[in-house]
């Protein structure tokens, strides 16, 4: 039995017998289930302030293909400086997120400093890479002083446990065993995340959930990290029934440029 099949079986049993929060949730404002009245194809019609979800021309996520990128060596490795800081875990009903209380460090893009604010998790992944959708995606949301946003995305496939999520497992379990939607997680270190910035994609897009705000700088890591089936199961158990698979469908690229950086190597080592 594959790990993916096992995950689905465990998830079904957990929803039937132990997901107490699913029994008491009222209908959500939006759903990830295609075909539902409040599903992804209808997000733009649910509220006037969500109109961009249906009419925006630079929406995320998108399909990333190596044969449709513009190579740009001037991008360079990410200039990031993260630090351990107090954080809380929040269950929005649609996803589990890490919300940093203090200064968790920053990322610099085009000489603009973006502070790390929170980390969202989506399963399966929202972005696809060369036709493949992965088991999990972590999205690190950053904001600048003038309210510009930048998201760093890490794609995961099943394998060894992710060290960052390993530190949070006991807290995530509490969401599926109680009515809590916010838990203090103590000091959380974003450096535990498996970020390999030797190769990545860069494009302009949007947030992937309503109100689907555009003008977001996306950086998607080329190297895929690993996460255990158990860790993904815990994230799925925590959310509402209509967000178990909380990945927005792929959006049209609409002739946007997707840039690609890869650190060059020579016989003497990395250039």
Curated annotation (Swiss-Prot):
UniProt note on tissues of expression: Expressed in tuber (at protein level).
GO biological process entries: carbon utilization; cellular oxidant detoxification; cellular response to carbon dioxide; one-carbon metabolic process; positive regulation of gene expression; positive regulation of phagocytosis; response to oxygen radical
Domain spans labelled Alpha-carbonic anhydrase: 28-262
Signal as UniProt keyword: yes
Control of this protein's activity: The carbonate dehydratase activity is not substantially changed by the addition of Zn(2+).
Record: residues binding L-ascorbate: 95, 120-122, 139, 208-209
Catalytic reaction annotation: hydrogencarbonate + H(+) = CO2 + H2O; 2 monodehydro-L-ascorbate radical + NADH + H(+) = 2 L-ascorbate + NAD(+)
Residues in the signal sequence: 1-21
Post-translational modification: Not glycosylated.
Entry annotation: catalytic residues: 94 (proton acceptor)
Key words, A-Z: Allergen, Antioxidant, Disulfide bond, Lyase, Oxidoreductase, Signal, Storage protein
GO MF entries: antioxidant activity; carbonate dehydratase activity; L-ascorbic acid binding; monodehydroascorbate reductase (NADH) activity; nutrient reservoir activity; protein homodimerization activity; serine-type endopeptidase inhibitor activity; zinc ion binding
Record PROSITE patterns: ALPHA_CA_2
Mutagenesis / variant outcome for changing residue 139 to A: Slight decrease of dehydroascorbate (DHA) reductase activity
Cross-referenced InterPro entries: Alpha_CA_prokaryot-like, CA_dom, CA_dom_sf, Carbonic_anhydrase_a-class
Disulfide links within the chain: 53-212
EC number, as in UniProt: 1.6.5.4, 4.2.1.1
CDD domains: alpha_CA_prokaryotic_like
Effect of residue 122 to A: No change in dehydroascorbate (DHA) reductase or carbonate dehydratase activity
TM region(s), chain numbering: none
Function: Storage protein of tuber. Involved in protection against oxidative stress. Has carbonate dehydratase, trypsin inhibitor, dehydroascorbate (DHA) reductase and monodehydroascorbate (MDA) reductase activities. Catalyzes the reactions of carbonate dehydratase and DHA reductase independently of zinc and glutathione (GSH). The coupled reaction is capable of recycling a plant antioxidant ascorbate using ubiquitous compounds H(2)O and CO(2). Exhibits antioxidant activity. Able to scavenge 1,1-diphenyl-2-picrylhydrazyl (DPPH) radical. Exhibits immunomodulatory activity.
Subunit details: Monomer. Homodimer.
UniProt family annotation: Belongs to the alpha-carbonic anhydrase family.
Protein name per its UniProtKB record: Dioscorin dioA3
Highest classification ranks of the organism: Eukaryota, Viridiplantae, Streptophyta, Embryophyta, Tracheophyta
Gene for this chain: dioA3
């Amino acid at each position: 039995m594959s790990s993916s099949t096992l995950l689905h079986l465990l998830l079904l049993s957990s929803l039937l017998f132990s997901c107490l929060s699913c029994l008491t949730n009222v209908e959500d404002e939006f759903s990830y289930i295609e075909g539902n009245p409040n599903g992804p194809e209808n997000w733009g019609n649910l509220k006037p302030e969500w109109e961009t979800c249906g009419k925006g021309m630079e929406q995320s996520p998108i399909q990333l293909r190596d044969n449709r990128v513009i190579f740009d060596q001037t991008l360079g490795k990410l200039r990031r400086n993260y630090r351990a800081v107090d954080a809380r875990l929040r269950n929005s009903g649609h996803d589990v997120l890490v919300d940093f209380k203090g200064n968790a460090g920053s990322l610099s893009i085009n000489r603009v400093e973006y502070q790390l604010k929170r980390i969202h998790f989506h399963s399966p992944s929202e972005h696809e890479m060369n036709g493949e959708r992965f088991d999990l995606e972590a999205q690190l949301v950053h904001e600048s002083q003038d309210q510009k946003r930048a998201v760093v995305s890490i794609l995961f496939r099943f394998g060894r446990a992710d060290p960052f999520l390993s530190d949070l497992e006991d807290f995530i379990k509490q969401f599926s065993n109680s009515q809590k939607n916010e838990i203090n997680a103590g000091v959380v270190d974003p450096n535990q995340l498996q970020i390999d910035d030797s190769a990545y994609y860069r494009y302009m897009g949007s947030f992937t959930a309503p109100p689907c705000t555009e003008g977001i700088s996306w950086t998607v890591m080329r190297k895929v990290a690993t996460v255990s089936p158990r860790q993904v199961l815990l994230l799925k158990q925590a959310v509402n029934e209509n967000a178990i698979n909380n990945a927005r469908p792929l959006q049209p690229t609409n002739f946007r440029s997707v840039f690609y950086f890869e650190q060059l190597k020579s016989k003497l080592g990395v250039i």
